[in-house]
A protein has these predicted regions:
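Conserved alpha-helix/loop element of class I SAM-dependent methyltransferases that forms part
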Residues: 1-11, 26
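Short, glycine-/aromatic-enriched active-site segment of Class I SAM-dependent methyltransferases
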Residues: 117-138
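Short alpha-helix
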Residues: 139-155
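Class I SAM-dependent methyltransferase SAM/SAH-binding core
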Residues: 12-15, 19-71
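A short SAM/SAH-binding and catalytic strip from SAM-dependent methyltransferases
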Residues: 80-94
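A short acidic, Gly/Pro-enriched loop at the edge of an enzyme's catalytic core
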Residues: 70-82
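Conserved Class I S-adenosyl-L-methionine
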Residues: 160-215
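A short glycine-rich, Lys/Arg-flanked "PGG" loop and its adjoining helix->strand segment in the class I
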Residues: 96-111
Length: 215
């Protein structure tokens, strides 16, 4: 991610669904100037992030604000970088903000990075509940091709969509082997064995990047 966002120093960076601040703090460790703004819907996570910023002595670099569900309350062309990350630091309260709205607040030449967990077909509330039980709190219905199309429709260029499901699958397999709870068996079975839903067949971890044209 860092390579696709460089340079970071002195940049204005927006982090969507910033949770307890994992990504903003990660960015702050890699820059000495600029402004990193995280927006989050969950009040408890927002409060925790603000407290952590003070404790870490990063309030001069990092700010956290309450998010809105369907829009970004910022002017056009405001940020140099935008990150929407749902894999390493997922939030239980995602927004419903699409790529066009994200692109709107990016400056010309600005860079966008999105990570997501996707299912390629609709799943029932019962299946979603079983996956939630093992820690898969958020799933986006769509395909890698959909994400590419959405980025293109938002006017972004230099688009790349990467599938890194095989790397994450090994992590889930280790978790299953270490988890003795019988209530989690169905969730692991769905994610790792179900013919239509399992990782690499119906569920994927993707990384998406794009750039807003400079002119």
């Amino acid at each position: 991610m860092q390579v696709d966002l460089e340079p970071l120093n002195g940049k204005s960076i927006l982090v969507l669904c910033s949770g307890a601040g994992g990504i903003p703090f990660w960015l702050a460790e890699r820059t000495t100037q600029g402004h990193i703004l995280g927006v989050e819907l969950d009040d408890d996570l927002l409060g925790a992030a603000r407290l952590s910023a003070e404790e870490k002595g990063l309030s001069h670099l990092v700010e956290f604000r309450k998010a809105e569900k369907t829009r970004l309350a910022f002017p056009d062309n405001m940020f140099d970088r935008l990150i929407s990350e749902f894999i390493i630091f997922p939030t239980p309260t995602p927004t419903e903000i699409g790529q066009p709205e994200m692109a709107r607040v990016l400056k010309p030449g600005g860079k966008m990075v999105i990570t997501d967990v996707i299912v390629t077909k609709p799943i029932s509330p019962e299946v979603r509940k079983e996956l939630n039980a093992i820690g898969l709190d958020y799933l986006c219905e769509g395909t890698a091709g959909d994400f590419r199309s959405w980025m293109q429709e938002a006017g972004l260029t230099d688009i790349e969509v990467k599938d890194f499901t095989p790397l994450v699958k090994a992590v889930w397999e280790r978790r299953r082997n270490q988890d003795a709870s019988p209530v989690h068996r169905t969730g692991y079975s769905l994610l790792l064995e179900d013919a239509s839903l399992k990782l690499g067949e119906g569920t994927f971890y993707i990384y998406v990047r794009g750039t807003k044209p400079a002119t």
